[in-house]
């Protein structure tokens, strides 16, 4: 499960971090979070769909940047004006096309270059591992802020920037 490159991996981790922040901001302590891999019920597609929605919300909220997102009910909303007989077939074909565009092309969670279904599933394994690393931790209101600092220090210091001669300056 090789990652395409270290800079890409770092950017994907930042995208996941944005998702985690949005999810924590929107949820109270007793709510079920969306930033998690639900073993037994989730697919790579359902996980990535939730992450895409959270990322869109985060980019709009924190960066004031609009992100294109295709919701699951996009096809139904698009073709409501068609007759029932033709609409079912049209929705099926449109859904399949959108699914391919949405999941089998590079995106904000592509740790690997994704341009087909096989690569999507390879990337999905990596994405699940990354989500599972973070899902049990709380970023907002956490007394363990040092853990987050240590994590980013390790990411920056031990791989992502050393190849370019750039180093992270540790906190005293």
Per-region residue spans from a language model:
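Core catalytic lobe of class I
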Residues: 7-25
């Amino acid at each position: 499960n090789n990652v395409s490159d270290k800079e890409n991996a770092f950017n994907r981790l930042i995208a996941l971090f944005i998702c985690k922040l949005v999810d924590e901001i929107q949820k109270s302590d007793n709510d079920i979070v969306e930033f998690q891999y639900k073993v037994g019920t989730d697919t790579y597609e359902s996980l990535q769909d939730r992450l895409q929605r959270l990322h869109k919300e985060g980019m709009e909220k924190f960066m004031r940047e609009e992100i294109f997102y295709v919701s699951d009910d996009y096809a139904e909303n698009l073709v409501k004006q068609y007759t029932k007989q033709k609409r079912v077939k049209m929705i099926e074909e449109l859904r399949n096309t959108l699914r391919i565009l949405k999941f089998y092309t590079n995106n904000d969670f592509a740790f690997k270059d994704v341009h087909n279904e096989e690569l999507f599933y390879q990337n999905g394994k990596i994405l699940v591992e990354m989500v599972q690393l973070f899902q049990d931790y709380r970023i907002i209101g956490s007394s363990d802020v040092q853990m987050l600092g240590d994590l980013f220090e390790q990411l920056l210091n031990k791989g992502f920037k050393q190849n370019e001669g750039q180093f992270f300056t540790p906190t005293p």
